[in-house]
Regions:
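Bacterial N-terminal signal peptides
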Residues: 16-28
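Signal peptide processing junction and immediate N-terminal pro/mature segment
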Residues: 29-33
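Proline-centered structural pivot motif
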Residues: 642-644, 908, 945-960, 970-1005, ...
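Beta-strand/loop edge motif enriched in small/polar residues
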Residues: 271-812, 822-893, 899-960, 970
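Residues that cap or anchor secondary-structure elements
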Residues: 34-323, 330
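Bacterial N-terminal signal peptides that target proteins for export
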Residues: 2-19
Length: 1009
């Protein structure tokens, strides 16, 4: 039954625009009219925290301030007293070149042939000593010496770069050593083909490998992780604690042609330790063929042509000339220049691995300004914004465990430094070209299968890259948007699943794939001329393309399988509909609907049935009569539409004004806003929002869903408000009221869920008569709560506050019960003579927690994971040092207690009964036992501390329906006391209203298409 008739009166557009200007003047900060100062307030080995202060403007006299974190591996080094910015260059002093202004220290000898000519000290003080020895070809058990290192003198040719010309006998080659703030690199630089044809050594070019041997005389203890590859090949990741050697590459100096993988092995031969890099001749030769056959006659060529062959590595090592074992020729470094003629390079890098754990925190903006690596546990929280500087090296590489915590309306967004549409405005806002190299580079060696979902990448050279994800531990990219990048996805040596991904405005969708199994479903590829491009043989990889839309993206040269895919070439200009910042909806009358015929992954299908290809409805003007909004766009519950699906938006608004009427939201409706305020409650208005336990109403910023900035929308740095109550001239009688249940708020981090605090604009400017928030989720942002009269009430019951915070002050009555305040800030200013109550809540890692004004009435609260506490300490509080939560298959959210016990957990520790708390049909347990049925301890009538989820059926995954009449218990027994006699407006959850008894519920979903 509708709460109100669906009627909407629209005032003229001029008045609406005045309202928008008012909100912008109040909240929006115009960066162009401000002076900006930056201060570094914290430094670490790989990061710095920057505070930004923007001066005031006539519209915002107070100005603006914010903070961001800049990341780059090796950004600083510790000089014994403080962190200093790294300066990766060599100080050249006679026989030595020393780089000591980085966390790792490098020393090179002028004559590379001397023993221990290359020395590296890792950030943790471990020493690595080595020198290159020779190149050899191998085919099966046969090995042939190609060239030995000879006396050669180093030249400083530029900041951080030393070159040893004429480094080998018999071939025209050099060795280059580069020091950077994040690592150290050796390049073997080949100038022509002389002496490098495997056929000259009686070896099969299809099976031979070229090897570069280096002797390691001292090294930290290593940990080697095998990386199984295609065709029974294996590479290893070699970790030395704070530094590691990853897979190298062979490539042309001009950047054209493929990057050929360089494999490694590391260990002892004949009692000595060697690092051996190898490259397959069949791929490597296509690089060498781009070089001239000969550059200049080599006086030692005749010796090389003698072709020495060996059947064991020991025999080969024994044959080396004494000069290569130990050289004593005196030499000094000199300055030189690098001849930038075409060459082929074989490289390896010893890089800092940053084993520390890291969190990309929801609500924060990060700037990746150089190569950034993590090998500890890296956590990505939905709502984090990761920006990249525009240079050739800004990248994010992960080789350790990944915890990916993103969800619908909480994507992880990776974009350019100059993109001010999201996150804090840390640059000019003038976008040009592509920024990061590999925006997200994921290595799967030794890791379990990984699901990356709800991700958006913009303005990268390559958006996502993966390597070493096998059939047993595949990498899945799901529900992602990749826009305005050079390349979308690059996969090597592994199994990759790319599902429900939008790729638009790219140069190529899939690039440089190599020995990859790529299984795609529900792709939309648009404004992208090439579906694939690789300089390797495409036949060594396989493609499956199911239920996808390839619009004007050439698949020439690619053989793929799959079903339900529409390929249009040249591209259609009418295939998609655009609304707001979403440019890839299907028109409602599209003939493509329901044409996705392929059988797809079960979980992917379940997700898509909750998503849509239909653009939202647009709501403009002002609500003047009681109005109810329900879902308006079609969820894909019947035969699947092909192509990428969006997380649904039902109604797109700039700012929705509500005056003298009640706005109702129901049944999981989603409202997205583009302005600085979402819903503006004016005099005489009310908001009544009630979703469903398993399908909550949502109020969100449009950027949480749509891939591009919308015309006229405010930027990411604007402080926005989902529900705004700023009004002049209101009294308690005409003040707005807010009543929300089963409603999720996503206004953007640093913004407001609800702004009702008194202060700005007069004593009653933000006055509200009543705020009731129950069973709601607040992600990021602030709940700013206040009223300047004791007749007003604010009641918070059983809500989740995820990061962000709560600020409350004023004269109203206030209570908070059964909250989970997770990593949130709490600020409370209670009026004199008040009885503000805080009971049965869990404060998890909250900081800061500040309180001023009158004393609070608080007891029976849980403080876990180091959370700060309300003061003074209360006798019945629970303080638990380590507490965690769980998700469960078929459950609602990942907030069930892993320790649901009385002895050590939060079970039955509350201040009142579950009936008084209204949580009879809720639970904190993974087993879905509702409070009313839980007899696990002697005090089982007492409510469990903290946030509860509605108990669901373990067979259907839907909220429990005891009497099987199709109405959930929690909706029939609205006050949640499980009383035998229902209260007014309730029905008995034990007795079927339909007369069906207690049989399993028959749930009828009317297809919306």
């Amino acid at each position: 039954m509708n709460m109100f008739p669906l009627r909407l009166l629209v005032r003229n557009a001029f008045e609406g625009s005045l309202m928008a200007v008012f909100v912008l003047c109040l909240l929006h900060v115009s960066a162009s009219a401000q002076e900006t100062t930056q201060e570094i307030v914290q430094r670490g080995a790989h990061h710095r925290v920057v505070d930004v202060v923007q001066s005031g403007t006539p519209e915002n006299p107070a100005g603006n301030s914010f903070r961001y974190t800049e990341l780059a591996t090796g950004m600083h080094y510790w000089d014994g007293t403080e962190w200093k910015a790294s300066d990766p260059d060599y100080d050249v002093n006679g026989p030595l070149a020393v780089a000591h202004r980085t966390a790792h220290k490098v020393t090179l000898k002028a004559n590379l042939a001397e023993e221990d000519s290359v020395q590296v000290v890792t950030p943790d003080g471990q020493e690595f000593r080595a020198r290159p020895l020779f190149l050899a070809y191998r085919d099966g058990t046969n090995v042939a010496l190609v060239a030995e290192l000879k006396d050669c003198v180093g030249e400083w040719i530029g900041p951080g770069v030393v070159l040893y010309n004429a480094a080998f006998d018999g071939i025209n080659a050099a060795i280059r050593y580069s020091v950077t703030q994040f690592g150290f690199e050796q390049d073997v630089v080949l100038y022509d083909q002389q002496g490098l044809n495997p056929a000259d050594y009686l070896m099969n070019p299809e099976s031979a490998t070229l090897e570069c041997w280096s002797e390691v005389t001292q090294a930290p203890q290593s940990q080697q992780t095998a990386q199984p590859l295609a065709n029974q090949e294996t590479d290893v990741l070699i970790n030395f604690g704070t530094m590691e050697i990853r897979q190298g590459a062979a490539f042309t100096s001009t950047g054209d042609g493929p990057q050929v993988p360089v494999f490694k092995r590391y260990g002892q031969v004949a009692g000595k330790t060697f690092l051996v890099e190898s490259v397959k001749s069949r791929e490597f030769w296509q690089l060498l063929e781009t070089l001239p056959e000969f550059s200049e006659p080599n006086p030692e060529e005749a010796r090389v042509r003698k072709k020495r062959f060996f059947s064991t590595d020991q025999a080969l090592l024994a044959s080396l000339s004494p000069r290569a074992r130990k050289a004593t020729t005196a030499a000094t470094f000199r300055r030189g220049t690098f001849d930038r003629k075409r060459a082929v390079v074989i490289d390896y890098q010893l890089v800092q691995s940053n084993p520390n754990n890291w969190v990309f925190t929801a609500g924060e903006t990060f700037l990746v300004s150089g190569p950034t690596t993590f090998s500890g546990v890296t956590r990505f929280e939905g709502g984090s914004i990761i920006k990249f500087s525009k240079n050739v090296s800004a990248s994010l590489s992960i080789s350790g465990p990944v915890v990916w915590d993103a969800a619908p309306y909480r994507p992880v967004i990776m974009t350019a430094r100059d993109d001010n549409s999201v996150g804090q405005p840390i640059s000019t806002g003038t976008l040009s070209g592509n920024y990061s190299t590999d925006c997200l580079n994921l290595t799967g060696s030794g890791q379990p299968a990984l699901l990356i979902q709800h991700l958006r990448v913009s303005h990268a050279q390559t958006a996502v890259r993966g390597q070493y994800w096998g059939a047993s531990n595949p990498l899945t990219i799901r529900h992602a948007q990749i826009v305005n990048c050079g390349a979308g996805f690059r996969g090597e040596f592994g199994t990759y699943r790319v599902q429900n991904v939008l790729m638009s405005g790219l140069g190529v969708a899939f690039s440089a794939y190599y020995y990859a199994t790529i299984q795609t479903a529900h792709l939309t590829v648009n404004s992208t001329p090439l579906f694939h491009q690789t300089t390797y043989n495409p036949s060594v990889s396989t493609f499956v393309v199911d239920n996808s839309l390839l619009n004007g993206s050439s698949t020439s040269g690619l053989t793929y399988t799959g079903a339900g895919t529409t390929y249009t070439y040249p591209g259609s200009t009418t295939m998609f509909a655009t609304l707001g910042g979403g440019g890839h909806y299907l028109p409602k009358t599209s003939g493509l609907r329901n044409s996705g015929t392929a059988t797809i992954d079960t979980q992917l299908k379940a997700d898509l049935q909750r998503m849509t290809t239909e653009p939202p409805s647009v709501l403009a003007g002002e609500v003047l009569l009681d109005t109810e909004l329900a879902p308006s766009v079609q969820r894909d519950t019947d035969a699947l539409d092909p192509g990428a699906h969006y997380v649904p938006i039902d109604w797109l608004v700039s700012t929705l004004n509500v005056t003298g009427s009640t706005l109702g939201l129901k049944d999981g409706v989603v409202i997205a806003f583009t302005n600085a305020a979402g819903i503006w409650l004016k005099a005489g208005s009310a908001l009544k929002s009630e979703g469903l336990p398993h399908r909550m109403n949502v109020i969100t910023r449009y950027t949480a869903v749509q891939e591009s900035p919308a015309a006229g929308a405010v930027g990411g740095g604007t402080v926005a408000t989902a529900i705004y109550t700023g009004n002049t001239g209101v009294s308690l009688a005409t003040a707005p009221a807010v009543d929300c249940r089963f409603t999720a708020f996503h206004p953007g981090y640093g913004s407001y869920h609800l702004f009702t605090s008194d202060g700005v604009g007069g004593a009653s400017f933000y006055l509200t008569k009543a705020v009731k928030l129950r069973d709601c989720h607040f992600y990021g942002g602030l709940l700013s709560l206040g009223a300047n009269t004791a007749s007003a009430t604010v009641e918070l019951n059983n809500n989740l506050v995820y990061r962000g915070g709560i600020v409350c002050g004023g004269l109203m009555n206030f209570s908070m019960r059964n909250h989970l305040n997770w990593r949130a800030s709490i600020s409370v200013t209670a009026p004199a003579g008040s009885a503000w109550g805080f009971h049965d809540n869990v404060f998890d890692g909250c900081s800061p927690v500040t309180q001023t004004g009158a004393a609070l009435i608080h007891n029976y609260n849980g403080y876990v994971n180091g959370s700060l506490r309300l003061t003074p300490s209360a006798a019945n509080d629970r303080v638990i040092a380590s507490f965690s939560y769980a998700s469960v298959s078929g459950g609602l959210e990942p907030w069930y207690h892993t320790d649901a016990t009385y002895a050590t957990g939060l079970l039955d520790r509350g201040s009142q009964t579950w009936a008084a708390a209204g949580l009879a049909h809720h639970t904190v347990k993974t087993g879905q036992v509702p409070e009313r049925s839980d007899a696990s301890s002697g005090s089982s009538t007492l409510v469990d501390m903290g946030f509860h989820l509605v108990a669901v059926s373990t067979s259907t995954g839907l909220p429990v329906d005891t009497d099987g009449d199709g109405f959930f218990d929690v909706m029939e027994d609205r006050n949640g006391d499980a009383a035998t006699t229902p209260s007014s407006g309730e029905s008995d959850f034990n007795v079927s209203e339909s007369g069906l008894g207690g049989s399993a519920p028959l749930l009828v979903f009317t297809p919306l298409k």
